[in-house]
């Protein structure tokens, strides 16, 4: 899969956050987006996922235009900062909600959930509520949930925030396993060391402009 971004522009009121953004993302790479707070990194992810609109430009998935505020949930997914799990639903219910809503056969969805949860070592926690999980466990639940529609590219918003070193190591391993299975990733992070560790490319948003570097 290939995401193409052409001449994208986003403003909040009179303030232009970024403009003239031209990028491509593919499902065989991990790309990190770095930059100071307030540079519009998370907003960019939300635009790609159809959660916010942009002012001008084009976003296309494999050549198919995605109008502002729309997306294809079977091609791109997102793991939010803070995970956004439903507190009154069990882990199992959280994970099955999206595929059932999107019309995936219940039995198929349950089999997929079990397989993914076992791969990420979270299956034994399936009957618990989010409040009873550690931060790392909640994140793995959020990753499984985001993978349930089998997107080709998965976005992460500040995935290392509030995680300890050992949990960050497990996250890096999880991302590498997903990449080996053919899933690309776009990762917003302030953690420079983590970005260098996982990324094929690092993008920097600075004062509305974009700079790119290749990670050796």
Residue ranges, per PLM feature:
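Catalytic Walker B motif of ABC-type/P-loop ATPase nucleotide-binding domains
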Residues: 154-157
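The feature captures the beta-strand-to-loop junction immediately N-terminal to the Walker
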Residues: 34-36
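Conserved ABC ATPase signature
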Residues: 129-133, 137
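A short, proline-enriched helix->beta-strand linker immediately N-terminal to the Walker B motif
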Residues: 148-152
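Conserved structural motif at the start of ABC-family nucleotide-binding domains
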Residues: 3, 18-20
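Conserved ABC ATPase "signature" region
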Residues: 107-124
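Helix-to-loop junction immediately C-terminal to a conserved catalytic motif
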Residues: 49
């Amino acid at each position: 899969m290939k995401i193409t971004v052409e001449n994208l522009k986003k403003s909040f009121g009179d303030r232009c956050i970024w403009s003239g953004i031209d990028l491509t993302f593919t499902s065989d790479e991990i790309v990190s987006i770095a930059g100071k707070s307030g540079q519009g990194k998370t907003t960019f992810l939300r635009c790609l996922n159809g959660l916010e609109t942009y002012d001008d430009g084009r976003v296309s998935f494999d050549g198919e235009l995605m109008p502002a505020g729309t997306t294809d949930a079977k091609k791109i997914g997102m793991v939010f900062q803070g995970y956004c799990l439903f507190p009154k639903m069990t882990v199992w219910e959280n994970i099955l909600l999206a595929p059932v809503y999107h019309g995936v056969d219940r039995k198929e969805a349950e089999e997929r959930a079990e397989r993914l949860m076992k791969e990420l070592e979270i299956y034994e926690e399936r009957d618990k509520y989010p409040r009873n999980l550690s931060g790392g466990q909640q994140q793995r639940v959020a990753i499984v949930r985001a993978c349930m529609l089998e997107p080709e590219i998965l976005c992460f918003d500040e995935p290392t925030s509030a995680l300890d070193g050992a949990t960050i190591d497990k996250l890096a391993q999880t991302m590498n396993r997903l990449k080996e299975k053919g899933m690309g990733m776009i990762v917003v992070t302030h953690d420079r060391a983590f970005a260098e560790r996982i990324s094929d490319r690092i993008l920097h948003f600075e004062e509305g402009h974009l700079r790119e570097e290749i990670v050796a």
